[in-house]
Swiss-Prot record:
Region (Necessary for nucleocapsid assembly and virus assembly): 1-33
Organism: Venezuelan equine encephalitis virus (strain P676) (VEEV)
Stretches assigned to the Cytoplasmic side: 723-757, 791, 1247-1255
Site (Involved in dimerization of the capsid protein): 200, 233
Region named Transient transmembrane before p62-6K protein processing: 730-750
Extracellular compartment spans: 276-701, 758-769, 813-1225
Motif Supraphysiological nuclear export signal, residue range(s) on this chain: 41-48
Protein name: Structural polyprotein
Transmembrane intervals: 702-722, 770-790, 792-812, 1226-1246
């Protein structure tokens, strides 16, 4: 038949039914949304396939059996093949006996997956069930020679040897443990602390491990699985399951595991339930029974089943009871098991619609509520009609059924239209809820046409697209980045939210009343009852009937009212429906299409064009959508900015050496650091020096230049004044004496003519001929003054730059203490000098530093939902409010609301018609997915992930920075901490929302205010201790229709989401990175970490075994200061022998990149270093020898870099020698002028005084 042999044997053809099934009706498809429908269908099918395994397909014809097996299958001996097959078919389809029926209820075992097979094989002799009353209540497993069993699991281990062991209790970990006998230790599990992120195996398949949490798909694992092990691919136990909690589409597991030190740790998510198989009991007529096994079910006794559900509505096992009541025992499960079918307990209803085609009306498709809180553009509606059920209450997809004056009718869902400003696309419906995707609009309208009548209902609601992320886009992009968001689930999974139901009240149905002759006849529907009230003349009739009855006293239909009564169906507890008389039986059903965590594609704005300047960055922005730009400084004061950019713009920012960060839209953060660079040349001419230091230190440079200018000005002015004063004092006596002869020296000093010498040359000639000593003194005085001033200035003004020593360079024999900066990625190198031993190098690099605060959850807040009871209406009588016990519940009695025979109640009285209105507050249906958590933060613990190298031994370890907890590796004992700075970015009160942390001073529990954060508060998402304060006020209803009007403050949670500032992720100081699960800050560049080493002797090397240098010379080949290892030093040496030597700089002038170098007997070694000094001069230690390295460094060329500098940033660049030379020269010239003036003044004064005494 085939030209080749198939690789695998062909499967038998499936069984074909000879009777063709009726063809399904064809419905036209909606072309514009075809791609969307295919995508949603694929997603739904994937969910169903992943979360449950479908039933096996119908069996095909039996495969061809070997001849030796044929006699065993033939019971009649001489029957042929056809007869044999007919016998099989008959045996399969015939009426089974009770034993066979009980056996058929059991599904055939499905073939487990690869992971399950592996775990089952390993569990067979290492895991033992714990039995309680004949049922498996949990499991115990043997790991590492010890028996572990959960402490909350009661019962006896199904092994005589293990059951006889005496166990010890560890209540902190919810475990009991004991040592197993020696003969059983060979067949035990091995455990491991290695847990890389990925998938692991347990009894039910795959377990995902991510961010320190184990999760499984929802529905996988349940009560009775406590104690089961989770294994890796090598069959080692990584955790033991204790319980779980549903979180949307996933279930988080509570587990016990081991850390790197082999210490047991326990992780328990919030609201976790223990998975011991404890039977939940329910109540019926004062008789208890297991909730999963009710004595009645809905298909057999509907009214009694609803009453049973109402009694147990607050029972923890209500979901089990509801599921069992809907699926009667003995019924075969179908592939739609995951889709709850509980809405067959309800029926549609007619309610008042505020806006129909013309005014208000009593509509079969009244819209009760509209929600659009997701980020995917979908809308969830709650209506009075129902979806997924036909008129008989059976499951039927893509169908809507509605109530038309007591008659339930159905219509295909594609004939129902929904639109806002434009038509919507209806995705699916379930129960009272409809999921659709709608364009933006201020109202939403639903309508359908039946025959020639069009039914419609509109409600005001602003439908808009809610973008996620930091760009305000209006339509999902085709390409972009994936970001966590909240989307409406497209399935009817049980996610823990409920909608309240109750038995419907009496509803007027005029179609039940007819006129037969001159009498009124009331005919109730088959199987239902009707309440008849008539007022005929002076006769009042009030009677309940279940079959047609004629009332001869009444001759007009208007004299009677017929109310339909139904106690076998629930309806939604709507304020548009009247409440049933007496005690109303309430229930609750699950809400489909809830918000769930998902991934959304968000747009990426065009990358900004970045221009770097001197300590500045310029961003040229071109957003396509309004985009947020957030910046912060990575210093102690973040000085953050947060701006929404809608148009092309240019923004300029200052960048410092401590760093600067900006976040543009949905792009990841980018960080920049400034380098110590500037124009000019610190080793050049004066104007180049001034330009360089003006850009680096503008204020200091201006101040220094101002001081120098003032000194020069004062010097010139003082010298001039002194010279003039001396000249006047010297010449005045001679000017007052007639014919006085002025001495030659005085004439020269005072620039005055003598009687004998007319010119300067004549004066010098006179001194040369008459007094040569004075001649040489006159010439040497200025030169001597210049020499003296120059020497004085050299001693006074030559300032040595101040450098701070970073830390100790050596240590004692066994112990070494040092301090390293608390900054991730920056290496710290040092050596340990010990007498008689070679220096031991130590290198430490922190890869990550975590700061984890101790937090206490105060409460959870979210959107609130206003619950309204159907109003209790009493005609011809009064009512009172019953005591209130629900959150923010309001109750009020209104009298005279409904007039005689008109309005919603159709009362027969004109007065004393009362209505009791009740409203209260509850958590929204989507509170589980969309909520904020208010925490109080306390003392924080610090963890440092260090890469440590001691000598030639390296290790990556985690250290608790508390000064107490040591870490041991290769015999080295390391103790870190405590931090030099007790600092945390978290305030005392913090709020966690959508994976981000906010410092927010929230109100205390029980002190919330309307319209503000905390207006509703609950201790946990699932707890029932709800506090609410929403300013709920009931208003008087109008007579036209039954309703409960009210006013209420807007949601404080929603207002807080609109007004909240940027989270700590964008505003934390010191460049902290903020994360959740657990709440923590990482890589905060603040403070320093003290380290204490205790090093064993084995790691030291004798000095005789290491080389020694006989000659060494260091030259700086290249040096760029304030740059990442921008210096290169070459050391030429002669060594005693080849070997490896530690290198170190004892001072803090330079930071070396290398911790050790390889030496030969003669050669050179190249060493890279970083320095912040313009003229570095440091001693370099190589083994036990020292060599001095010095030279000049130039500023870096790049103004801005994308990584922090790996040198000690506490050192600032010193003033260059060239600058000191120019400054000394400037100040020296000014001082010479002053000293010359002082010398002249002194000589003149001495001469004048001597001359006066002589005279």
């Amino acid at each position: 038949m085939f030209p080749f042999q198939p690789m695998y044997p062909m499967q038998p053809m499936p069984y074909r039914n000879p009777f063709a099934a009726p063809r399904r009706p064809w419905f036209p498809r909606t072309d514009p949304f075809l791609a969307m429908q295919v995508q949603e269908l694929t997603r739904s099918m994937a969910n169903l396939t992943f979360k449950q395994r479908r039933d096996a397909p119908p069996e095909g014809p039996p495969a061809k059996k070997p001849k030796r097996e044929a006699p065993q299958k033939q019971k009649g001996g001489g029957q042929g093949k056809k007869k044999k097959n007919q016998g099989k078919k008959k045996a399969k389809t015939g009426p089974p006996n009770p034993k066979a029926q009980s056996g058929n209820k059991k599904k055939p075992n499905k073939k487990p997956g690869k992971r399950q097979r592996m775990v089952m094989k390993l569990e067979s002799d290492k895991t033992f069930p714990i039995m309680l009353e004949g049922k498996i209540n949990g499991y115990a497993c043997v790991v590492g020679g010890k028996l572990f069993r959960p402490m909350h699991v009661e019962g006896k281990i199904d092994n005589d040897v293990l059951a006889a062991l005496k166990t010890k209790k560890a209540s902190k970990y919810d475990l009991e443990y004991a040592d197993v006998p020696q003969n059983m230790r060979a067949d035990t599990f091995k455990y491991t602390h290695e847990k890389p992120q990925g998938y692991y195996s347990w009894h039910h398949g795959a377990v995902q491990y991510e961010n320190g949490r184990f999760t499984v798909p929802k529905g996988v694992g349940a009560k009775g699985d406590s104690g089961r092990p989770i294994l890796d691919n090598q069959g080692r136990v990584v955790a033991i399951v204790l319980g779980g909690v549903n979180e949307g589409s996933r279930t988080a597991l509570s587990v016990v595991m081991w850390n790197e030190k082999g210490v047991t740790v326990k992780y328990t998510p919030e609201n976790c339930e223990q998975w011991s198989l404890v039977t939940t009991m329910c109540l019926l007529a004062n008789v208890t029974f297991p909730c999963a096994e009710p004595p009645i079910c809905y298909d057999r006794k509907p009214a009694e089943t609803l009453a049973m559900l109402s009694v147990n509505v607050d029972n923890p096992g209500y979901d089990e009871l509801l599921e069992a009541a809907v699926k009667c025992p003995g019924r075969k499960r179908r592939s739609t098991e995951e889709l709850f079918k509980e809405y067959k307990l309800t029926r549609p209803y007619m309610a008042r619609c505020i806006r129909c085609a013309v005014g208000s009306c009593h509509s079969p498709i009244a819209i009760e509520a509209v929600k659009s809180d997701g980020h995917d553009g979908y809308v969830r509606l709650q209506t009075s009609s129902q979806y997924g059920l036909d008129s008989s209450g059976n499951l039927k997809g893509r169908t809507m059924r509605y109530d038309m004056h007591g008659t339930i009718e159905e219509i295909p869902l594609h004939q129902v239209s929904l639109h806002t400003s434009r038509p919507c696309h209806i995705v699916d419906g379930h129960g009272y809820f409809l999921l659709a995707r709608c364009p933006a609009g201020d109202s939403i309208t639903m309508e359908f046409k039946k025959g020639s009548v069009t039914h419609s209902c509109s409600v005001p609601y602003e439908v808009k697209f809610n973008p996620v992320g930091r760009e305000l886009y209006t339509h999902p992009p085709e390409h972009g980045a994936e970001q966590a968001c909240q989307v409406y689930a497209h399935d009817a999974q049980n996610r823990g939210a409920y909608v309240e139901m109750h038995l419907p009240g009496s509803e007027v149905d005029s179609s039940l009343i007819s006129l037969s002759g001159s009498s009124v006849t009331v005919t109730p529907p088959v199987g239902t009852s009707a309440l008849v009230k008539c007022k005929c003349g002076g006769t009042k009739i009030s009677e309940t009937i279940n079959k047609a009855k004629q009332f001869s006293q009444c001759t007009k239909k208007e004299q009677c009212r017929a109310y339909r009564l139904q106690n076998d169906k629930w309806v939604y507890n709507s304020d548009k429906l009247p409440k049933a008389a007496g005690a109303t039986l309430k229930g609750k059903l699950h809400v489909p299409f809830l918000l769930a965590d998902g991934k959304c594609t968000v747009p990426l704005a065009p990358e900004p064009m970045i221009t770097f300047g001197f300590r500045s960055v310029s961003l040229k922005l071109h957003p396509k959508n309004p985009t947020y730009l957030t910046t912060r400084q990575l210093a102690d004061e973040p000085h953050y900015t947060h701006e929404l950019i809608s148009e092309p713009a240019v923004r300029n920012f200052t960048v410092t050496e401590k760093g600067w960060e900006f976040v543009w839209g949905n792009h990841p953060p980018k960080r920049f650091w400034a380098q110590e660079t500037a124009p000019g040349n610190p080793h050049g001419l004066p104007h180049e020096v001034i330009t360089h230091y003006y850009h680096r230190y503008p204020m200091s440079t201006i101040l220094g230049l101002s001081i120098c200018a003032a000194i020069v000005t004062v010097s010139v002015a003082a010298s001039t004044w002194l010279f003039c004063k001396s000249r006047v004092s010297c010449l005045t006596p001679y000017r007052l004496t007639p014919n006085a002869r002025m001495p030659l020296c005085l004439a020269v000093l005072c620039c005055a003519r003598t009687a004998r010498a007319e010119t300067t040359w004549e004066s010098l000639d006179h001194l040369w001929n008459n007094n040569q000593q004075m001649f040489w003194i006159q010439l040497l005085i200025p030169l001597a003054a210049l020499i003296v001033v120059t020497r004085l200035l050299k001693c006074v003004c030559c300032v040595v730059p101040f450098l701070v020593v970073a830390g100790a360079a050596g240590a004692g024999a066994y112990e070494h203490a040092t301090t390293m900066p608390s900054q991730a990625g920056i290496s710290y190198n040092t050596i340990v000098n010990r007498a008689g031993y070679a220096p031991l190098p130590i290198s430490i690099t922190p890869t990550k530093i975590k700061l984890i605060p101790t937090v206490n959850l105060e409460y959870v807040t979210c959107h609130y939902k206003t619950g309204m009871d159907s109003p209790a209406i009493k005609c011809c009588g009064s009512q009172e409010c019953t005591p209130t016990n629900r959150p923010d519940e309001q109750c009020k009695v209104f009298t005279g609301v409904y007039p005689f025979m008109w309005g919603g109640a159709y009362c027969f009285c004109d007065t004393e018609n009362t209505q009791v209105s009740k409203a209260y507050v509850m958590k929204s249906d989507d509170c589980l997915a969309d909520h904020a958590e208010a925490y109080k933060a306390h003392t924080a613990s610090v963890q440092a992930f260090l890469n440590i190298t001691v000598g030639e031994h390296s290790i990556v370890t985690t250290v608790y920075v508390n000064g107490e907890t040591p870490v041991n590796f290769n015999g080295v004992k390391l103790t870190a901490g405590p931090l030099s700075t007790a600092w945390t970015p978290f305030d005392r009160k913090i709020v966690q929302y959508a994976g981000e942390i906010y410092n927010y001073d929230f109100p205390e529990y029980g002190a919330g205010q309307p319209g503000a954060f905390g207006d509703i508060q609950s201790r946990t998402v699932s707890s029932s201790d709800l506090y609410a304060n929403t300013n709920l006020v009931l208003q008087r209803p109008k007579a036209g229709a039954i309703h409960v009007p009210y006013t209420q403050a807007p949601s404080g949670f929603e207002q807080w989401k609109k007004d909240k500032a940027p989270s700590l992720k964008f505003t934390a100081p010191f460049g902290c990175e903020i994360y959740t699960n657990p709440i923590r800050a990482e890589n905060c560049a603040v403070g320093s970490i003290p380290l204490a080493f205790d090093i064993p002797d084995a790691l030291f090397t004798r000095v005789s075994e290491t080389p020694t240098l006989s000659a060494a010379e260091c030259t700086l080949n290249e040096c760029v200061y304030s740059s990442d290892f921008g210096g290169i030093a070459t050391v030429k040496y002669s060594a005693s022998k080849s070997g490896k030597c530690a290198v170190h700089v004892p001072s803090g002038t330079a930071t070396l990149k290398e911790a050790a170098v390889e030496l030969t007997e003669q050669g050179s070694a190249t060493i890279h270093f970083s320095t912040a000094n313009i003229h570095p001069e440091f001693r370099l230690q190589i083994c036990t020898s020292y060599v001095t390295c010095k030279g000049d460094c130039h500023p870096p060329k790049d103004h801005i870099v994308t990584h922090p500098q790996y040198h000690a940033q506490t050192f600032t660049a010193a003033v260059s020698k060239t600058a000191w030379t120019w400054l000394t020269s400037l100040l020296g010239g000014s001082a010479v002028i002053i000293i010359i003036g002082l010398v002249l003044a002194t000589i003149v004064a001495m001469y004048v005084l001597t001359n006066q005494k002589h005279n």
